[in-house]
């Protein structure tokens, strides 16, 4: 979210909003998702109308992460309903608290919350926006640019999620290795059993593939190359990879892994969200498949849709 402000904010917006964020003085949230729209961002119904020198925003938002602790919100709303589909939306910088931006509730999920976690990162909030007045100069990135900015932000968010998933998977495998080298059953270490080694080898292969995917995408991002196809493929792979590795680590720990004596059980419930956030698996797979067909029809090969253009 801060990267969006860095890349699209005016000098004044960066001074007023980005600088205190970078200094750790304030926190920010992103209010895009709506109940009725879900993964279809173009289905959003929150509207913003220009009234003199202010925009007036009305609507509802859903699963706005960290809204309960935020001092600033990026709010996406429909400003141009008659424009082409992807040019109907704009993004606004909102200073919080504001009576027009109210948290209805913090949404309970399958991942248990801790007091420290709520204090540091807040929760996922349901928001009602009623006659929220925003100064005209708080429009971010230009009118009609909200959708494209949002997709750009999500692309980098998927990269960050992927890094987190690799780190968690690596740590889970570390915990599993630490357990199997000490645990003995029937007079033999678990680490010396062929089946256990196969399980750990499979995890290592998945982590290795995930790392290479991330490095390739990061390279393309640094070079300003189009990374949408690879990012979609990797998003699905990494979300399922971390689930598989953590699940294997739990299995290798036995009942201990199912308990809260290790962090594995907590991680397991938390990572289920990875197959939903920033686009569910099915949407990414659908788009990936469409791009494969498009590549073949254009080039006579699917290579460009499968990471074939590794470096340019």
What residue ranges belong to the model's regions?
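Extended, low-aromatic, Leu/Ala- and acidic/polar-enriched alpha-helical coiled-coil segments
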Residues: 156, 163, 194-204, 232-235, ...
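Alpha-helix capping/hinge segments and adjacent helical runs
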Residues: 225, 232-312
């Amino acid at each position: 979210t801060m990267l969006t402000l860095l890349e699209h904010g005016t000098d004044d917006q960066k001074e007023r909003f980005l600088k205190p964020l970078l200094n750790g003085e304030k926190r920010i949230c992103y209010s895009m998702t709506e109940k009725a729209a879900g993964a279809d961002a173009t289905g959003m119904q929150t509207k913003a109308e220009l009234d003199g020198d202010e925009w007036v925003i009305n609507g509802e938002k859903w699963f706005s992460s960290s809204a309960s602790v935020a001092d600033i919100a990026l709010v996406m709303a429909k400003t141009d309903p008659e424009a082409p589909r992807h040019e109907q939306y704009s993004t606004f910088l909102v200073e919080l608290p504001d009576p027009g931006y109210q948290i209805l509730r913090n949404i309970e999920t399958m991942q248990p919350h801790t007091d420290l976690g709520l204090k540091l990162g807040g929760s996922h909030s349901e928001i009602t926006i009623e006659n929220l007045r925003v100064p005209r100069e708080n429009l971010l990135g230009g009118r009609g640019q909200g959708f494209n900015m949002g997709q750009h932000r999500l692309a980098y968010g998927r990269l960050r999620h992927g890094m987190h998933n690799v780190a968690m998977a690596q740590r889970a495998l570390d915990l599993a290795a630490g357990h199997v080298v000490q645990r003995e059953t029937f007079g033999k270490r678990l680490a010396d059993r062929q089946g256990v080694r196969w399980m750990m080898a499979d995890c290592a292969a998945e982590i290795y593939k995930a790392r290479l995917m991330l490095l390739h995408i990061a390279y393309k991002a640094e070079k300003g190359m189009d990374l949408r196809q690879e990012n979609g493929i990797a998003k699905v792979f990494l979300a399922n990879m971390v689930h598989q590795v953590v699940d294997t680590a739990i299995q290798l720990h036995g009942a201990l892994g199912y308990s809260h004596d290790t962090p594995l059980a907590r991680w397991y419930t938390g990572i289920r969200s990875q197959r939903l956030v920033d686009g569910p698996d099915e949407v990414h797979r659908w788009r990936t498949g469409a791009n494969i067909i498009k590549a073949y029809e254009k080039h006579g090969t699917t290579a460009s849709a499968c990471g074939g253009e590794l470096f340019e």
